[in-house]
Regions:
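Nucleotidyltransferase catalytic core that binds NTPs
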Residues: 1-186, 197, 216
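Phosphate/ribose-recognition catalytic cores of enzymes acting on nucleotide-derived substrates
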Residues: 2, 183-223
Length: 223
């Protein structure tokens, strides 16, 4: 997320970062409970990067209505891939994004392309609701072995982290999504999906109990 902040700083006079682990985006309580939290470390990193403002709100402030008012997008886009395996996730995501937009009132809003389906839904919501905010998608930041950076990576053991590097490698090299599924399963990954859409190869897998997602830009898919 620091790369999103850096991009925002380059393109704007003021940058606002927000940290909020949104319970409404988790369809499993266990996943919410175990989601990595490092507030003090995050604050120190944002201070070092000289972010102008950090917005920290609790659930009672974000949801004074106890989550009774929600944003539902009803097309196929919000029913497939991530939505199929994480019911309610995109409802919670769109709802909290809209709330923060009304609080901050930004000129631009920045999102990572690793969550590509999420990015498309956000763009669609902004257009449908006439939100005068520019949506900026930012390239995925990766470790030296190609694994997309994610807070969930911290939950991987050393052995699992080594194995996880095969995830993006296979997505990049496999001739088809079906071949990618077979190769990932042969290495012991539990595969939720691999799909070629929007010029990208989108995928979600488990390494042990840790769920990883990716959305690689594949040039031959864009032609």
């Amino acid at each position: 997320h620091l790369s999103l902040c850096a991009r925002a700083q380059q393109e704007n006079e003021l940058t606002v970062a927000a940290i909020f682990v949104n319970a409404s985006q988790f369809n499993q309580t266990e996943d919410f409970v175990h989601y990595p939290r490092s507030l003090e470390e995050d604050q120190a990193l944002l201070e070092k990067q000289k972010i102008d403002y950090l917005l920290l709100l609790d659930a009672e402030t974000v949801y004074p209505d106890n989550y009774q008012v929600q944003i539902h997008e009803t097309s196929k886009l919000s029913k497939e891939l991530e939505a199929k395996f994480r019911p309610g996730h995109f409802i919670g995501m769109l709802t909290v994004v809209l709330k923060y937009l009304h609080i901050v009132k930004p000129t631009r809003s920045y999102y990572g392309e690793k969550d590509y389906q999420q990015l498309l839904l956000i763009k669609k919501m902004f257009q449908a609701l006439f939100l005068e905010v520019e949506v900026v998608g930012c390239p995925t930041v990766r470790a030296s072995d190609g694994l997309a950076l994610s807070s969930r990576n911290s939950r991987l053991t050393a052995q699992q982290r080594e194995k996880a590097a095969y995830f993006p490698a296979i997505l990049n090299q496999a001739a088809t999504s079906e071949v990618a599924v077979q190769q990932l399963e042969n290495l012991g990954f539990k595969v939720d999906y691999v799909a070629d859409q929007w010029g990208r190869r989108l995928a979600a897998v488990y390494v042990g109990e840790v769920r990883l997602i990716d959305a690689l830009l594949i040039p031959q898919l864009a032609t």
